């Protein structure tokens, strides 16, 4: 989204084979809900990366799919370059309009970190914000969708994706997909 800042997602804790589908969905939600790109650990299957890049090719936009050897280094570099790190967790500060305004009001690039089953302690310490999307067990996919929707105030749902070969025409019933060449 063109907010004057970049918003990227870092997916950590991917377990090969077991998390294939969840990691793909984290990438799909990141793109659809306004993020500019995603960092995936090198352990992520090539098929996940290929799927996300194919979605960008067919459905448009310039969403970046990048890999990282060391998520901690990615976090450190993001902060060194002036960005802030938001870790989504059920243990952090409860999401609120005030907290979203505080994060957004910084005017800095945002790295949103979503983890799997076991998030390393260093992330809680190095994140600028540990944001709880509810204090109950939940999906990182759902947490990311809620956070990005609040961050972009729903505007991401009306965005156009330049270069799209495929687009959906909303309808009460049926599926209307338009192919553009």
Curated annotation (Swiss-Prot):
One of its GO terms (molecular function) is tRNA (cytidine(56)-2'-O)-methyltransferase activity. S-adenosyl-L-methionine binds at residues 88, 115-119, 133-140. It is found in: Cytoplasm. It catalyses: cytidine(56) in tRNA + S-adenosyl-L-methionine = 2'-O-methylcytidine(56) in tRNA + S-adenosyl-L-homocysteine + H(+). It comes from the Archaea. It is an enzyme of class 2 (transferase). Homodimer. Belongs to the aTrm56 family. This is tRNA (cytidine(56)-2'-O)-methyltransferase. It comes from Thermofilum pendens (strain DSM 2475 / Hrk 5).
């Amino acid at each position: 989204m063109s907010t004057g800042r970049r918003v990227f997602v870092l997916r950590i804790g991917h377990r090969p084979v077991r998390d294939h589908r969840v990691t793909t969905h984290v990438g799909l939600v990141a793109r659809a809900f306004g993020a500019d790109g995603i960092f995936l650990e090198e352990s992520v299957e090539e098929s996940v990366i290929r799927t996300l890049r194919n979605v960008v090719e067919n459905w448009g936009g310039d969403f970046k799919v990048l890999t990282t050897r060391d998520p901690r280094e990615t976090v450190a570099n993001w902060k060194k370059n002036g960005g802030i790190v938001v870790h989504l967790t059920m243990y952090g500060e409860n999401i609120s309009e005030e907290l979203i305004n505080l994060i957004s009001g910084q005017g800095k690039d945002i790295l949103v970190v979503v983890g799997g089953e076991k998030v390393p302690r260093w992330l809680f310490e190095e994140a600028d914000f540990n944001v709880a999307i509810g204090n109950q067990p939940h999906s990182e996919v759902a947490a990311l969708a809620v956070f990005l929707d609040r961050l972009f105030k729903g505007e991401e749902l009306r965005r156009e994706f330049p270069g799209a070969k495929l687009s959906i025409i909303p309808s009460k019933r049926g599926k209307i997909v338009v192919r553009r060449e």
